[in-house]
């Protein structure tokens, strides 16, 4: 706990030192430029002060935005904020050290250059110490368990072929018989039966090989013909019962018109012809 407080205090100290150094550089550069004697040094000090103020000011802007707007963990804004906290400590140390060298190489006025250069060195050393802090590894977010329905009876691995190849359904675990079992229903449909067979052993590998569609269609046709054959005898039996009733028998020698129905006018015609 104490170590965490130390690192937090050091971080805020570095930020405040950076802002103070930028303010001193801008002030000294402005005064040097107003005197008009060393304009090149004045531009250098002003450029350095503005650069440091931009680098240090972004941290405070990020803190202000974090207070006004809540960033959800894992979002892009939250990752950018964490990166702004940790990125550039060692890089700032190197940059401040290099910027301070130019201040000591051309000491026009002791207080004009020595004070900004010294502040750059102190700020760089503070950032170097801050870079030794270990980064906190973000804890991986655990996704909530998704609701998933799994059939407790068995697991299915199916391999399907294309064209006229076979289709194999492999069941790695024996499943229980039951009217509501999806696999029993599928098996009964594939085999063309209504009542599935009782499995003899458990924890065995069972494969159901399906033949091509043509052969399956032939099997269905044969099954239909069997049913027809079973139905036809009942029809023939019914016809036989109806034929067993007494019927009038007739012979081939029986005349079509009975004798009693022969016309009586034929003898009279024959008699008239003779006379």
Swiss-Prot record:
One Gene Ontology CC term in the entry: membrane
Pfam families found in the cross-reference section: TMEM72
Compositional bias (Low complexity): 153-162
Keyword annotations from UniProtKB, A to Z: Membrane, Transmembrane, Transmembrane helix
TM segment ranges: 16-36, 41-61, 85-105, 108-128
Subcellular location, record wording: Membrane
Region feature Disordered, mapped onto this chain: 139-162, 235-264
Membrane topology: Multi-pass membrane protein
Segments of skewed composition (Acidic residues): 240-250
Superkingdom, taxonomy of origin: Eukaryota
Presence of the UniProt keyword Transmembrane helix in the record: yes
InterPro entries: TMEM72 (IPR032055)
Record PANTHER family: TRANSMEMBRANE PROTEIN 72 (PTHR28474:SF1)
Protein name: Transmembrane protein 72
Organism this protein belongs to: Mus musculus
Gene: Tmem72
């Amino acid at each position: 706990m104490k170590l965490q407080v130390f690192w937090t205090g050091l971080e805020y100290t570095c930020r405040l030192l950076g802002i103070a150094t930028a303010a001193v550089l801008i002030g000294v550069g402005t005064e040097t430029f107003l005197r008009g004697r060393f304009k090149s040094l004045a531009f250098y000090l002003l450029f350095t002060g503005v650069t440091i103020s931009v680098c240090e000011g972004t941290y405070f802007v990020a803190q202000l935005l974090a207070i006004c707007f809540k960033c959800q963990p894992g979002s892009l804004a939250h990752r950018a904020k964490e990166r702004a906290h940790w990125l550039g400590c060692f890089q700032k140390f190197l940059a401040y050290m290099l910027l301070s060298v130019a201040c000591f190489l051309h000491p026009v006025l002791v207080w004009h250059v020595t004070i900004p250069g010294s502040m750059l060195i102190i700020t760089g050393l503070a950032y170097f110490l801050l870079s030794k802090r270990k980064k906190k590894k973000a804890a991986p977010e655990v996704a909530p368990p998704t609701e998933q329905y799994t059939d407790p009876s068995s697991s299915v691995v199916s391999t399907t072929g294309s064209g006229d190849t076979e289709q194999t359904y492999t069941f790695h675990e024996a499943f229980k018989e039951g009217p509501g079992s999806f696999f029993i229903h599928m098996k009964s449909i594939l085999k063309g039966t209504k009542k599935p067979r009782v499995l003899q052993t458990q924890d065995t590998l069972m494969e159901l090989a399906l033949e091509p569609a043509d052969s399956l269609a032939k099997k269905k046709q044969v099954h239909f013909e069997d049913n027809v054959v079973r139905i036809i005898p009942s029809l023939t039996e019914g016809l036989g019962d109806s034929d067993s009733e007494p019927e009038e028998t007739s012979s081939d020698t029986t005349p079509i018109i009975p004798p009693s129905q022969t016309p009586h006018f034929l003898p009279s015609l024959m008699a008239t012809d003779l006379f």
